[in-house]
Each structure stands twice: as C-alpha cells, then as structure tokens.
C-alpha cells in the first residue's frame, strides 16, 4: 500500500518522521517526492484493518511543527 502526504512546508521533517520507522503497527519507507507530495510504502501486520491515514495524521499532529501545519494524507 502507498500513502501520499502533501505539505508545502516541513517536507524534510515529515520524511524523517516516517522513513524507516514503525508507528502504531504501520511501517513506513520513503519511495519518492513529486512537488509537494511525499510518497511512502506502508506495511504492517493486518494492515488492511488499520486506519493508515488516521495513524499518519495523528503522528504529524503530535509533533511540535504539526499542530499548525496544513497538510493532507491520502491512500494511493
């Protein structure tokens, strides 16, 4: 499964937050950048039953910079 995180700001910090990390059972690997869009391959046990978008949004909002950041997360 792939997800897209779109944000005009803080792309490097978002990439560092997820790349090679596992958050709430979801493992992220950076797969590319297209403009303001960061693409990640996501894997995990029982991934089809996890709300990957909500987990990703929650992780960004939990950062110091994420509270005021405009971004979107979608499944590709």
Explain the meaning of each model-derived region.
Residues 11, 40-41, 71:
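Generic detector of low-complexity/intrinsically disordered segments
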Residues 17-21, 55-63:
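Conserved short hydrophobic interaction patches
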Residues 4-8, 31, 43-45, 74-76:
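A structural detector for beta-sheet-dominated domains
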Residues 4-25:
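Short amphipathic alpha-helix segments
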